[in-house]
Amino acid sequence: MKIGIDTMGGDNAPSSVIEGVAIYLTQNTQDNVVLFGNKSVIEKECVDRIKDLSRVEIVDCKEKIEFDDEPVKAIRQKKDSSIVVGLKYLKEKQIDAFVSAGSTGALMAGGLLIVGRIKGIDRPALTTKLPYKSGQYLLIDVGSNTDCRPINILQFAQMATVYASKVLGKNNPTVGLLNIGTEETKGNDLSKQSYEILKNAKNINFVGNVEARDLPFSPPDIVVCDGFVGNIVLKLTEGFGLLFFDILKDIAKLSLKAKIGGLLLKPYLKNLKGKYDYKEVGGAPLLGIDGIVIKCHGSSDGQAIFNGINQAKTFYENNVLELLKEEITAESEV
């Protein structure tokens, strides 16, 4: 497998990106990578980290898309940026997948304008796994579409259903619509109209509305919403995870008994922390693009980048893209 990686995207790039690539290549000895970015900088980062440079191709890119760039304008004007060149390689099938911790908007715009959509999908969407008390659920969309129509919500649910069943092994996964109440009549116009279209859809296991307070305890397998709401849920979940462990650290400092208790609980808390750490998830697949695109967190470190690349590999090995195309095409022709 050959995976393309944007070395210029993210708060800690390129150092953290190359660190993640080095870990990946060490553990996946049959795979190759194509690194997009400033060649001289990449070469310096690679020298001390990657032993077998024969498995590394570097594509020199003179431009970089910043997080505050207007996405569509940046894609059209910065033709020699790591995101644009990387997505062109994906479109031309010179790489099997593309991973980036760069601008979400630019990745979305570039995916649409350069790679193109799966037939039958109006808008691609980002999905990620979030923790709850006894497992994980899929949340879609987590930031690529701030304004949606009911048909978009339906397509998000359809794509997430394929992903959950084929990659996560969920049998007939349940789908819930994130709303301000469980009653069918609750919510704004988008929520009410989306409820109707989801309720009448034959290819998803819709179980009704789900409230945000239920997400940490008993969510359905898939929770669907627009990207504005989804991104808030994602970042609030991350924030509460960090807050919880900060509070525990403060409590452990209160007394000797508290410190001893903290030491006894440390192995269990370490496992719990992993559930709430975005680094362990790695990245969010951009479902609906006619290619494998993984968006990593903007503040990703090496471990998070490594997990994001691993996610691209899992997507590829499970043939998810072709399964999505088959499922969505079949539904659009009904």
Swiss-Prot record:
Pfam family, one: FA_synthesis
InterPro entries, A to Z: FA_synthesis (IPR003664), Phospholipid_synth_PlsX-like (IPR012281)
Function: Catalyzes the reversible formation of acyl-phosphate (acyl-PO(4)) from acyl-[acyl-carrier-protein] (acyl-ACP). This enzyme utilizes acyl-ACP as fatty acyl donor, but not acyl-CoA.
Description of how the protein assembles with itself and partners: Homodimer. Probably interacts with PlsY.
HAMAP family: PlsX (MF_00019)
Enzyme class: transferase
EC number: 2.3.1.274
Family: Belongs to the PlsX family.
Lineage: Bacteria, Bacillati, Bacillota, Bacillota incertae sedis, Caldicellulosiruptorales
Cellular compartments annotated: Cytoplasm
Keywords, alphabetical: Cytoplasm, Lipid biosynthesis, Lipid metabolism, Phospholipid biosynthesis, Phospholipid metabolism, Transferase
Keyword Lipid biosynthesis recorded: yes
Pathway: Lipid metabolism; phospholipid metabolism
Principal subcellular localization: cytoplasm
Ranges annotated as spanning the membrane: none
Enzymatic reactions: a fatty acyl-[ACP] + phosphate = an acyl phosphate + holo-[ACP]
GO cellular component, one term: cytoplasm
Organism: Caldicellulosiruptor saccharolyticus (strain ATCC 43494 / DSM 8903 / Tp8T 6331)
PANTHER family, per the entry: FATTY ACID/PHOSPHOLIPID SYNTHESIS PROTEIN PLSX (PTHR30100), PHOSPHATE ACYLTRANSFERASE (PTHR30100:SF1)
Gene Ontology biological process terms from the UniProt entry: fatty acid biosynthetic process; phospholipid biosynthetic process
Domain of life: Bacteria
Protein name stated in the entry: Phosphate acyltransferase
A GO term, aspect molecular function: phosphate:acyl-[acyl carrier protein] acyltransferase activity
